[in-house]
Amino acid sequence: MTHRFLEACRKQPVDRLPVWMMRQAGRYQPSYRAVRANVGFLELCRSPELIAQVTVAPIDEFGFDAAILFSDILVHLPAMGLDLSFEKGEKGKGDGGPKIANPVRTRADVDALKVPAPKKDLPYVLDGVRAIRAALRDRVPLIGFVGGPFTVASYAVEGGSQGFTRLKTMLYAEPRTAHALFEKLTQAAIVQIEEQIAAGAQAAQIFESWLGELDRADLEEFAFPYLARIAEAVKRTGVPSIFFSTGTTAHLEPISKLGYDVVSVDWRIPIDEARRRAPGVAIQGNMDSTVLLGPKEVAVERALSIVRAAGREPGYIFNLGHGIQPGTPTETVKAVVDAVHAFAWK
């Protein structure tokens, strides 16, 4: 079966624009909140049955053109030797941010990290992928994902605190330690995404959310080489690859040459400019998720303005510039999806 999302990833013509949204399974959904009323976040991430339930729900509720595996970019850290937990939020069930009790601070800490073996250490993720594929019945494709090395390192080194001071200091004070850490995290990302694809994921997104913290020189030394290796690993599997980051539009040209099929951009760049500056890749994005918190009519018009600006050329996927925020009205999400699907050039 041909899927318009996968065709758009490969810059092929589609019958209508594909749309999905980051965090399309999340706290804005009553169905998700009902699940979370009974289980903690990590408990949810470790239940294949619940992973499938919350992953498939947005497809049924909103008609998205792709599902994305429900998991977390840090779910593998315990297998690497780090003590991961999620702070208690308002509901007391781990809705808050991640905390790492034994953060990575020294070369000895890096050397002690183990590269996970997903079949042994993360079977619930792979079983979740298989359960999702069975539940979807090929209605839409499934996107697997991992976190990028810098973003995962920011949590592993900082321990959950806000900011990037310790990690960025490591780049300058102990560059060999930083490279050793990024090497371990790159290996971890590659084995995870390869196993997700082997289990049935039909595309792969790399979330390098905090890459905008780095300048060009640091990107070229500490980020781009590792990200290119992940892209090459995905390419060997034959499924499309998507790169996501925020705050990096100044570096769009080199990012578009890392080897990914799709580059997902945030709202800080006009979508037509992104397409001009990165002609070799498909573009995904890029509505500010905060727009969805405003009037429904405003969100629909903003979405359509982005679609028009993206132009007629194949290789465009409508998405947000970041994840859907808690409190977003579900009727607004549905209205935007329907409007993008109904759009046609006159």
Swiss-Prot record:
<feature type="binding site">
    <location>
        <position position="155"/>
    </location>
    <ligand>
        <name>substrate</name>
    </ligand>
</feature>
<dbReference type="Pfam" id="PF01208">
    <property type="entry name" value="URO-D"/>
</dbReference>
<dbReference type="InterPro" id="IPR000257">
    <property type="entry name" value="Uroporphyrinogen_deCOase"/>
</dbReference>
<comment type="similarity">
    <text>Belongs to the uroporphyrinogen decarboxylase family.</text>
</comment>
<dbReference type="InterPro" id="IPR006361">
    <property type="entry name" value="Uroporphyrinogen_deCO2ase_HemE"/>
</dbReference>
<protein>
    <recommendedName>
        <fullName>Uroporphyrinogen decarboxylase</fullName>
        <ecNumber>4.1.1.37</ecNumber>
    </recommendedName>
</protein>
<dbReference type="GO" id="GO:0004853">
    <property type="term" value="F:uroporphyrinogen decarboxylase activity"/>
</dbReference>
<comment type="function">
    <text>Catalyzes the decarboxylation of four acetate groups of uroporphyrinogen-III to yield coproporphyrinogen-III.</text>
</comment>
<feature type="binding site">
    <location>
        <position position="209"/>
    </location>
    <ligand>
        <name>substrate</name>
    </ligand>
</feature>
<feature type="site" description="Transition state stabilizer">
    <location>
        <position position="72"/>
    </location>
</feature>
<dbReference type="GO" id="GO:0006782">
    <property type="term" value="P:protoporphyrinogen IX biosynthetic process"/>
</dbReference>
<feature type="binding site">
    <location>
        <begin position="23"/>
        <end position="27"/>
    </location>
    <ligand>
        <name>substrate</name>
    </ligand>
</feature>
<keyword id="KW-0963">Cytoplasm</keyword>
<dbReference type="InterPro" id="IPR038071">
    <property type="entry name" value="UROD/MetE-like_sf"/>
</dbReference>
<keyword id="KW-0627">Porphyrin biosynthesis</keyword>
<comment type="subunit">
    <text>Homodimer.</text>
</comment>
<keyword id="KW-0210">Decarboxylase</keyword>
<comment type="pathway">
    <text>Porphyrin-containing compound metabolism; protoporphyrin-IX biosynthesis; coproporphyrinogen-III from 5-aminolevulinate: step 4/4.</text>
</comment>
<feature type="binding site">
    <location>
        <position position="72"/>
    </location>
    <ligand>
        <name>substrate</name>
    </ligand>
</feature>
<dbReference type="GO" id="GO:0005829">
    <property type="term" value="C:cytosol"/>
</dbReference>
<keyword id="KW-0456">Lyase</keyword>
<feature type="binding site">
    <location>
        <position position="322"/>
    </location>
    <ligand>
        <name>substrate</name>
    </ligand>
</feature>
